[in-house]
């Protein structure tokens, strides 16, 4: 396993609000390494105490852990479930699509 690339204690993050999974509302916080690579992702939905909130927070922790150990965020994005038009079916895919679109601008 690749060793973890630590983050600075203080870092800027971007907040994104978006919908996924049939209109459920989510908020994402995205932190980056100084060179611009994604370093950390926080996900939450807008229903305190819900099961989906727990799942998306755990998903974001897993994603963050993976990229801090060398996983390619773009490879993860491409591997996630999509519908027949190529749209992300889940919140992680949806937020990674938003990040990819912002990066291409």
Annotated model-derived regions:
Residues 1-105:
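Long, C-terminal-biased catalytic regions of enzyme "large/alpha" subunits
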């Amino acid at each position: 396993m690749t060793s973890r690339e630590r983050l600075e204690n203080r870092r800027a993050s971007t907040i994104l609000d978006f919908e996924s999974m049939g209109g459920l509302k989510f908020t994402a916080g995205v932190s980056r390494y100084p060179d611009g690579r994604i370093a950390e992702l926080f996900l939450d939905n807008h229903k305190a105490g819900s099961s989906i909130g727990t799942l998306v927070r755990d998903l974001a922790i897993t994603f963050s852990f993976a990229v801090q150990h060398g996983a390619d965020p773009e490879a993860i994005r491409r591997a996630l479930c999509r519908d027949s038009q190529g749209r992300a079916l889940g919140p992680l895919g949806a937020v990674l699509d938003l990040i990819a679109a912002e990066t291409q601008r």
